[in-house]
Amino acid sequence: MSRVKRGVTARARHKKVLNQAKGYYGARSRVYRVAKQAVIKAGQYAYRDRKVKKRTFRSLWIVRINAAARQHDISYSQLINGLNKAGVELDRKALAELAVYNKDAFAAVVEKAKAALA
């Protein structure tokens, strides 16, 4: 068995981590040991926040739908209930898009929901 020296692989590994840590503040972008921890933590935050992003956007859509619905004298929960009873299968993302960019179409959807509730 010949002796394995780690010079090339270690340098490559260090370089990879330090490239991932580019733009970090201070030692986090320069010192391998610190940069490695920073990159691992950044990966954890990124993984977690990819999940949180979905929740955040759903909350944003609900806020927008609620604001637009209240301009038509109906609450968000009543609107969703009415849409379910009317058999309208628009998701919250689409409803929020209508509420912001196509107010006439949103008004028609609200009328449909109100009719189903009456």
Swiss-Prot record:
The protein's role, per its UniProt record: Binds directly to 23S ribosomal RNA and is necessary for the in vitro assembly process of the 50S ribosomal subunit. It is not involved in the protein synthesizing functions of that subunit.
Protein name (record): Large ribosomal subunit protein bL20
The keyword Nucleotidyltransferase belongs to this UniProt entry's keyword annotation: no
InterPro entries in the record: Ribosomal_bL20, RIBOSOMAL_L20_CS, Ribosomal_protein_bL20_C
Record key words, sorted: Ribonucleoprotein, Ribosomal protein, RNA-binding, rRNA-binding
Family: Belongs to the bacterial ribosomal protein bL20 family.
Domain of life: Bacteria
Gene Ontology biological process terms from the UniProt entry: ribosomal large subunit assembly; translation
GO cellular component entries: ribonucleoprotein complex; ribosome
Gene Ontology MF terms: rRNA binding; structural constituent of ribosome
